Amino acid sequence: MYNTLKPVLQQELADIESAGLYKRERIITSPQGPDITVQGGKNVINFCANNYLGLSSHPKVIAAAKEALDSHGYGLSSVRFICGTQDIHKELEKKIAEFLGTEDTILYAAAFDANGGVFEPLFNEQDAIISDELNHASIIDGVRLCKAQRQRYKHDDMADLEEKLKATESCRHRIIVTDGAFSMDGTIAQLDKICTLAEQYNALVMIDESHCSGFMGKTGRGTHEHHNVMGKIDIITGTLGKALGGASGGFTSGRKEIIDMLRQRSRPYLFSNTLAPSITGASIAVLNMLSETTDLRDKLETNTQYFRKKITEAGFDIKPGIHPIVPVMLYDAKLAQEFAAKMLDEGIYVIGFYYPVVPQGKARIRVQISAAHEMEHLDKAIAAFTKVGKALGVIK
């Protein structure tokens, strides 16, 4: 039977290749950090990791992971409700809830699972999910698994969101769903305005904080702190795989009864192995660090402001904002790939993003700033961008 599928796949892969959309993986042979080594021994500066706070290889985080490995083992060989819940899992759930200002938290193997498993247990045909059109793929897939009515509002458009709320007033429950920060643009959701509309139209609010937890807001609690609406968000999903250590694991945090129901009925939680003890222990250490000081968050903010200012002065078209995701717009997919390849030659590791990850004609280099970057790293990146940009005719 594969003889019939094989030529179809070969042709489709060839089409992807010819369109300049084929994705190739670069191999890294070192720990994650601002300075990394790629296969072949080349040392480069990394500007494309979600390592916002530089904690992926932080000595305290590694030490905590090793300690948990020794004290609680390598794995649990079980889902949570059978024999997969250790004291450190409950401790981490409590710490996340305290950090975010919520009532309770449930852990998942990945943030994709958190978003994939949140809607179906809570909503049915009588309800409506009103989602930003640029929400993460995991939210889109999670909504597809649910029988609730689906409404998409135009990206970051409060007028269109209000129209969708008016159109669904007959529904039993309605929930507004948005990314806290959108991963391709670095746009921060207007959560204050969303909460105002939610109160006006009696709707719930859910945010995915994967690109915010740990550094958005004055103390890094997230978008809800940034917009001064802590306590008004019903569901917060997020990841341990970006700013909060960078390994893997996800969570859903929010109202007590919501979390209780997810423990009973959320399929990714019920049918996936528990989070590894080493990740759990390391994540506890991360939250302790971030609760004690905002030094890393503050440095990230300084680095981001500096890079955004300098890359703009160099003549590049970037998406405006304050987030450490800095999209350098190139528009053409093949140009984005060539640009990224030449940047690697200059010792700067960045990736070109293009369709289907971003819309057709919106190809870009997505730069991601880290607290682990020093000014020397940032200046080298600006110099490389300028050199390559001039060589390829992107800037004058």
Functional labels for PLM-detected ranges:
Residues 63-111:
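Conserved N-terminal alpha-helix of the aminotransferase class I/II PLP-enzyme fold
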Residues 51, 151, 155-207:
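Active-site phosphate-binding strand-loop segment of PLP-dependent enzymes
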Residues 201-204, 211, 216-322, 335:
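Active-site C-terminal subdomain of aminotransferase-like
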Residues 118-137:
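Conserved PLP-anchoring active-site segment centered on the Schiff-base-forming lysine
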Residues 101, 125, 145-147, 201, ...:
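Short, structured coil segments at secondary-structure junctions
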Residues 10-11, 15-72, 203:
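N-terminal "arm"/small-domain region of PLP-dependent enzymes with the aminotransferase-like
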Residues 298-307, 312-347, 357, 362, ...:
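Conserved PLP-binding catalytic core of the aspartate aminotransferase-like
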Residues 59, 63-67, 71, 94, ...:
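PLP-dependent enzyme catalytic core of the Aspartate aminotransferase-like
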